[in-house]
UniProtKB/Swiss-Prot annotation:
Naturally occurring in which organism (per UniProt): Klebsiella pneumoniae subsp. pneumoniae (strain ATCC 700721 / MGH 78578)
One Gene Ontology CC term in the entry: cell division site
Compartments (UniProt record): Cell inner membrane
Spans traversing the lipid bilayer: 4-21
Name listed for the protein in its UniProt record: Cell division protein FtsB
Length: 105
């Protein structure tokens, strides 16, 4: 009976070792679980970005206001008879701002 008990004990030790440290063990499970969590976070960010892009596409397809807004902001277009003004800061303020940026580096 002693040999059978020793054999069963050795089998139990081997099974426990393979469960904890072997291939597809708990270490691999926690690593894969962390990878899945990171991928889900990335997917959520990409889904939010895609939803925003689809909303912008729907807005551009549906109305003239969005097209006009993009033309004004990105291409600096104006309507006939309208004057476009661009406000530029003073040269002294620009020099001061660039000096502060260089000091921050």
């Amino acid at each position: 009976m002693g040999k059978l008990t020793l054999l069963l004990l050795a089998l139990l030790v081997w099974l426990q070792y393979s469960l904890w440290f072997g291939k597809n063990g708990l270490h691999d499970y926690t690593r894969v679980n962390d990878d899945v969590t990171a991928q889900q976070a990335t997917n959520a960010k990409l889904k939010a970005r895609n939803d925003q892009l689809f909303a912008e596409i729907d807005d551009l397809n549906g109305g003239q206001e969005a097209i006009e807004e993009r033309a004004r902001n990105e291409l600096s277009m104006t309507r006939p008879g309208e004057t476009f003004y661009r406000l530029v800061p003073d040269a002294s303020k620009r020099n001061q701002a660039s000096g502060q940026q260089q000091n921050n580096r």
